[in-house]
Amino acid sequence: MENFVISNIKARQVLDSRGNPTVEAEVYLENGGFGRAIVPSGASTGSGEALELRDGDKERYGGKGVLKAVWNVNSKIKDVLVNNTSDLHAVDQMMCELDGTENKTNLGANAILAVSLATAKANARAKNLPLYKYIAEIAGTEDEMSIPMPMMNVMNGGEHASWATDFQEYMIIPKGAGNISDAVRMGAEVFHALKEILKERDYPTTVGDEGGYAPRVRDGNNEPLECIKLAVERTGYYFGKDIAIAMDIAASEFFDKDHYVLKTNGDWKSADDMINWYDWIINNYPVVSIEDGLAENDWANWQIMTERLGNKIQLVGDDLFVTNSKLLKKGIKEKVANAILIKPNQIGTLSETIEAILLAKKAGYKTVMSHRSGETEDVSIAHLAVGLGTGQIKTGSLSRSERIAKYNELIRIADTNSNLGLVNPF
């Protein structure tokens, strides 16, 4: 438990990478410790996520302002925390008790998480530790610290790119890399080669929210896999050995009652059709991870998919679990998925984020730290991934500086700590 005392808290409204308002918070300690954090925002969100408090005033930012959340930090949260301990678990507990709701409806998860992350940074600075070491210390994961394998989003679809494809993300995993610098280089080389492939097919090379290319492909949801294959081969890497693929289907976004309705062509597919499709994909392409392959409420079919494909591939629950330990416990009990995506703003405090990661690891589930589509220059998730030893990280493409910032921070961390090796979970 930290013996530091919080002397001041301040929040303000700033912008995320999509030009939408978000919350930035600063925490000051009596001993001079200081932390600043900005929270991100999602596009495709799970229904069980903690509440992101927006103003709803159509006269300002189309109703997306966060002045209410900022006011909550500068008044209610500040009144409770100033002159109190900066111990992270205590701070998070006090904020949750002050909010008084399960999904942080009153104060807003965006207000609470901003203060939670800023407090962690202030404590780390007060102890003269990098954030990742402080996180490992409070979580008891010092022996698990490592550089995560990146999942790099190179083609966007779904909600992130106006339904250019039905599937939301096509990612490359530079699993043949020996260190994070090589991983970033390999990813960048494939990303640039992919641009040339798309140009040759007369596709535009504009990018989506997360920096991946977002062309409206002509030949269906498998065409991006072919384009990536050609890009990998053009760079001289071995498809499958050096570069593998991960996909985020985000199936909840096109689920309708008991069917999956593809928005690009109107086809209706059953859950069994979707599972068969994934089975075909992993037998024809080096796809090693599928996220949200079925809808968040389609639990019975998630069980079937896990039974059929769980020994072949990583099945990641994002909307399914929303970084919530209660939902993860249900998934573990019912043998649903075998990995969890971790997004701190889905649950709203750093303490609860750590709890979900530790629970997943204990159950043998893999963990993937993740950004959001509305990101910021804040690099906290790079430190969380290292300090908590998540083994994998999703932080976007090899373009857009809010994505690159996380890769650069991982390079810095590795450069200053030679004991931290790049993990290859595949």
Residue ranges and their predicted role:
Residues 1-22:
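Short, Gly/Pro- and small/polar-rich lid/capping loops
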Residues 40-129, 138, 184:
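Metal- or metallocofactor-binding catalytic centers and their adjacent structured scaffolds
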Residues 48, 140-141, 145-208:
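Mobile "lid/hinge" segments at catalytic clefts and subdomain interfaces of large enzymes
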Residues 81, 115-123, 127, 170, ...:
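Buried hydrophobic packing segments
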Residues 93, 130-153, 242-246, 289, ...:
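Beta-strand segments within the central parallel beta-sheet cores of soluble alpha/beta enzyme folds
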Residues 169-180, 205-221, 250-264:
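Active-site-proximal beta-alpha loop/turn segments in soluble metabolic enzymes
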Residues 222-426:
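Catalytic core of soluble alpha/beta enzymes
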